[in-house]
From Swiss-Prot:
Enzyme Commission number, as recorded: 2.7.4.9
CDD domains reported for this sequence: TMPK
Residues that coordinate or bind ATP: G7, I8, D9, G10, A11, G12, K13, S14
Family: Belongs to the thymidylate kinase family.
PROSITE patterns recorded: THYMIDYLATE_KINASE
InterPro entries attached to this UniProt entry: P-loop_NTPase, Thymidylate_kin-like_dom, Thymidylate_kin_CS, Thymidylate_kinase
Gene source species: Thermococcus kodakarensis (strain ATCC BAA-918 / JCM 12380 / KOD1)
GO cellular component, one term: cytoplasm
UniProt-recorded Gene Ontology molecular function terms: ATP binding; dTMP kinase activity
Keywords (A to Z) from UniProt: ATP-binding, Kinase, Nucleotide biosynthesis, Nucleotide-binding, Transferase
SUPFAM superfamilies (UniProt xref): P-loop containing nucleoside triphosphate hydrolases
Protein name per its UniProtKB record: Probable thymidylate kinase
Enzymatic reactions: dTMP + ATP = dTDP + ADP
UniProt xrefs under Pfam families: Thymidylate_kin
Length: 205
């Protein structure tokens, strides 16, 4: 089974991914907990570029284009799918990913790139069984991440986050595997809502 958690920053994706992994492990499943960007060379490059707001460009410190950024994310994802996701699924493991190609669609679409081009660029990606979109108002997102020492370009601009949230909700209408979860609820309530959907998927109602 392949499960993805999505949402704007501060929505609680990492927390819920860990809780979900523990739930599966307690039931005897072998779980692979992963994330995007990954820890591959591509992922490390992306993290460096994002954390510096694109100021550490590849050539002479010049900021890379949004198209180049999208291609880097796709390259990292291709390695992720080929080296970890596919082999793990073929081995019968449960794969839980904190972000996946839906993040690229939401963020890079918000940056002005063509959605169809982004979808085509990520067509190679293995489709998850279910995607939990942890939906959170942007003001609450900014409040939650304010205490973090985050320099990510994604987190700097309120307007970008607003567009990204709108895009996620539009994507949820396009991709039936995406299920919207109210991330304003407390951690336990959100977890229980996720588990209820997982049990339905597993036929354990």
């Amino acid at each position: 089974m392949f499960i993805v958690l999505e949402g704007i920053d501060g929505a609680g994706k990492s927390t819920q991914a860990k809780l979900l992994a523990e739930w599966f492990e307690n039931r005897g499943y072998e779980v692979v907990l992963t994330k995007e960007p990954t820890d591959t060379p591509f992922g490390k490059l992306i993290r460096r570029l994002v954390l510096t707001g694109g100021k550490e460009g590849i050539i002479d410190g010049a900021k890379i284009s949004h198209e180049a950024e999208a291609l880097l994310f796709a390259a990292d994802r291709a390695e992720h799918v080929d080296k970890l996701i596919k082999p793990s699924l073929e081995a019968g493991k449960v794969v839980i990913s904190d972000r996946y190609f839906y993040s690229s669609l939401a963020y890079q679409w918000a940056r002005g790139l063509d959605l169809e081009w982004l979808i085509d660029l990520n067509r190679f990606a293995v489709k998850p069984d279910i995607v939990f979109l942890l939906d959170l108002p942007v003001k609450e997102s900014m409040n939650r991440i304010r205490s973090r020492k985050v320099k990510s370009e994604f987190d700097k601009i309120f307007e970008l986050q607003r567009k990204v949230r709108e895009n996620y909700l539009k994507l949820a209408e396009m991709f039936p595997e995406m299920k919207i979860i109210n991330a304003m609820e407390d951690v336990e309530t959100v977890h229980n809502q996720i588990i209820a959907l997982i049990e339905t998927l597993l036929g354990e109602e």
